[in-house]
Amino acid sequence: MPPHQHPDVVKRLKRADGHLQTIIEMIEQGRPYVQLAQQLEAVERAIENAKKALIHDYIEQCLDRAGTAPGPRGRAALRELKAVAKYL
């Protein structure tokens, strides 16, 4: 799979997008705040899990490059790894 294709992450985000549309409808219908808060929490978790999956994949790619590319390319891969780690 090319480095920027993440079908599982896209699927998760599309599901979260659909969930958000449902929450908007719930708000417009005047549904109870507790239900809205629960659903918003679920969307937050879904987005967080998508982010983690994306970052974990990227970390794996960086580690592969760092291990197979000595010298400047390996060091560059480690710098990229450190840069993305702050989003975990």
Give the residues covered by each predicted segment:
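Solvent-exposed interaction patches of small proteins and small membrane subunits
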Residues: M1-L88
